[in-house]
C-alpha cells in the first residue's frame, strides 16, 4: 500500500567525503522502491511516479516525482492514464515495477488505488528507454468493483486481491510471472506472456500465495537465489506510516508459485486474518521470518552528540542479487526517529546464513565486502537489537552487551557466541540458536568502521549487533 497523504519531498542530503575511506551518500525519496539494473546503473521506481538512479547504491540522483504532467516518465500522465485514475478515483499512482523484455523495451506495471477501499486498476506502459517516456498499453487488472471481478466471480474484498504492488520477474527457467497484492484478499501470482508482458489467458486473478481477510500484508517481491535454489518472497507487514509498525519479512519455496514456508516450516497460505475481523495482526504476525522492524541504536556516553541512528517503519522492499560478486542487496524506504513521515531510500547488504535464510546487515551499504575475521577482532562491547516477531509501532532500542574473548555473551542478554570459518556467526541466547555472519562495515553515525553481526533463529527472529 502506498502513502497517499504525504507529498513525497525530494530529501537530498549529501555527506561529503573527508577522506578516501569515508563513503559518500546522497539520499533521495522514492516510496516503495523497485530496483532494476541497466548498463551498470541501478534504478528505483516508486509511488507517485518517483524514480532515482545510482551507480553504487549509495549516491543517488532523483529523476522524477509527482503524478503531474511534465513528469519525465509519463509526460502527459493525467491524459495517458486517465482511465486508470478515473477507475481508482485517484489523482496519484502507487508502487510500480519495471522490467526489460526480450524486445529490449522496458515495461512499467503501474497501478492506482482509491486508498480507503481496494478500488484499483493495474496496467502496462512501455518505453524504448529506461528513463522514459512510457506510453500506455492498457489496463490488465481491476479490483474493488461491486459486481463480478476479473475472474467472473462476485468481488469479495476479503477473498479477492487488491490489484496493486506488482513485482514482475523471470524464474530460473525463463518463465515470466507477476506477484502482487496488498491487504484485502492477499498476495497472488499470475503467469505472464514473455513477449507482450500481458497475463496469460484464463487465470482470473491467478493463484493465491498467502494473506486474506484484510491481513496487513503487502509489497511482495520475489528473488531467486542460485546459491540456495530457493525463491524468496519478501513481504511488508503492518501499516506504512510512522505509527503503523511496518516491517520486512521473508518466506521461501522451491517454486515461484509456491507453496511458501517460513523458517519454522509453517505454511504461508495460513498467514491470514480472522474472518469478520479487520487488521487482526496477532493472527498472522507469527508467520514469516522478520528481517527488520523499527529500531534505534541508542547513544552511549562515549558517542558523538546525537549520533544515535535508526529506522521507523522500514518496508516495501525490493532486492537484487549480483551474479558476478555473489552479493545480495535489500532496497527499501524508511522513516526515521523524530522526522515524522519524511522517508528516504536505504540499501543494506544481505547474506544467506547456514540454513539458507537471508540476514540483513545492521548498517546501510557503503561498498563493504565480507572478509576473514578473528575472534580478537570480534570480541568487545556491542549495541544489541532484537527485532522480535510482532507487528508494533514500538521502537526496538539497542541494549549493551559484550562478546567476551572466551565465547560468552554478557550484559543485557546472556549466552554464548562463536566464529566458524572466515565470518560465520552463531549466537545462543536463552537456549535459542541464531545463525548469521560477522561483518565489518561503516557506521554512518559514528563516522567509523565497526564490527557488526546479523543473525536469525529458526523461530524467525533477527538479531543485530554493532560494536561500540
Go through the PLM ranges and name each one.
Residues 2, 12-13, 448-451:
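Low-complexity intrinsically disordered segments
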Residues 18-468:
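Carbohydrate-active catalytic/glycan-binding domains of CAZyme proteins
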Residues 8-16:
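Bacterial N-terminal signal peptides
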Residues 1-7:
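Bacterial N-terminal signal peptides that target proteins for export
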Amino acid at each position: 500500500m502506498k502513502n497517499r497523504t504525504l507529498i513525497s519531498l525530494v530529501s537530498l542530503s549529501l555527506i561529503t567525503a573527508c577522506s578516501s575511506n569515508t563513503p559518500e551518500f546522497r539520499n533521495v525519496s522514492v516510496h516503495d522502491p523497485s530496483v532494476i539494473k541497466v548498463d551498470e546503473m541501478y534504478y528505483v521506481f516508486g509511488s507517485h511516479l518517483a524514480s532515482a538512479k545510482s551507480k553504487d547504491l549509495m549516491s543517488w540522483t532523483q529523476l522524477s516525482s509527482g503524478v503531474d504532467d511534465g513528469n519525465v516518465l509519463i509526460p502527459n500522465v493525467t491524459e495517458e492514464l486517465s482511465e486508470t485514475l478515473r477507475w481508482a478515483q485517484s489523482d496519484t499512482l502507487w508502487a510500480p515495477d519495471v522490467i526489460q523484455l526480450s524486445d529490449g523495451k522496458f515495461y512499467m506495471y503501474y497501478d492506482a488505488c482509491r486508498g480507503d477501499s481496494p478500488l484499483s486498476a493495474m496496467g502496462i506502459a512501455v518505453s524504448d528507454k529506461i528513463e522514459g517516456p512510457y506510453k500506455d498499453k492498457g489496463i490488465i487488472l481491476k479490483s474493488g468493483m461491486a459486481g463480478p471481478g476479473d475472474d467472473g466471480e462476485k468481488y469479495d474484498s476479503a477473498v479477492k486481491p487488491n490489484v496493486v504492488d506488482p513485482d514482475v520477474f523471470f524464474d530460473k527457467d525463463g518463465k515470466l510471472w507477476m506477484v502482487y497484492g496488498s491487504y484485502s484478499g492477499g498476495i497472488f501470482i499470475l503467469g505472464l506472456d514473455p513477449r507482450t508482458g500481458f497475463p496469460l489467458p484464463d487465470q482470473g486473478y491467478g493463484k493465491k500465495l498467502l494473506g486474506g481477510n484484510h491481513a496487513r500484508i503487502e509489497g511482495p517481491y520475489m528473488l531467486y537465489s542460485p546459491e540456495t535454489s530457493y525463491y524468496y518472497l519478501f513481504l511488508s507487514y503492518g501499516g506504512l506510516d510512522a505509527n503503523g509498525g511496518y516491517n520486512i519479512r521473508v518466506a521461501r519455496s522451491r517454486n515461484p508459485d509456491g507453496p511458501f514456508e517460513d523458517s519454522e516450516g509453517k505454511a504461508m497460505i495460513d498467514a491470514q486474518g480472522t474472518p469478520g475481523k479487520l487488521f487482526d495482526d496477532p493472527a498472522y504476525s507469527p508467520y514469516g521470518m522478520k528481517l527488520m522492524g523499527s529500531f534505534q541504536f541508542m547513544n552511549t556516553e562515549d558517542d558523538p552528540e546525537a549520533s544515535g541512528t535508526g529506522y521507523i517503519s522500514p518496508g516495501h522492499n525490493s532486492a537484487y542479487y549480483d551474479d558476478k560478486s555473489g552479493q545480495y542487496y535489500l532496497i527499501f524506504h524508511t522513516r526515521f526517529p523524530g522526522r515524522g513521515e519524511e522517508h528516504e531510500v536505504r540499501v543494506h547488504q544481505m547474506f544467506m546464513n547456514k540454513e539458507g535464510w537471508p540476514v540483513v546487515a545492521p548498517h546501510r551499504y557503503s561498498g563493504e565486502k565480507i572478509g576473514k575475521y578473528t575472534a580478537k577482532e570480534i570480541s568487545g562491547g556491542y549495541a544489541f537489537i532484537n527485532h522480535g516477531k510482532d507487528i508494533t509501532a514500538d521502537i526496538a532500542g539497542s541494549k549493551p552487551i559484550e562478546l567476551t574473548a572466551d565465547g560468552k555473551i554478557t550484559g543485557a542478554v546472556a549466552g554464548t557466541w562463536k566464529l566458524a570459518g572466515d565470518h560465520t556467526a552463531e549466537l545462543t541466547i536463552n537456549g535459542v540458536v541464531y545463525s548469521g555472519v560477522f561483518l565489518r562495515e561503516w557506521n554512518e553515525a559514528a563516522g567509523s568502521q565497526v564490527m557488526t553481526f546479523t543473525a536469525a533463529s529458526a523461530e524467525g527472529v533477527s538479531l543485530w549487533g554493532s560494536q561500540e
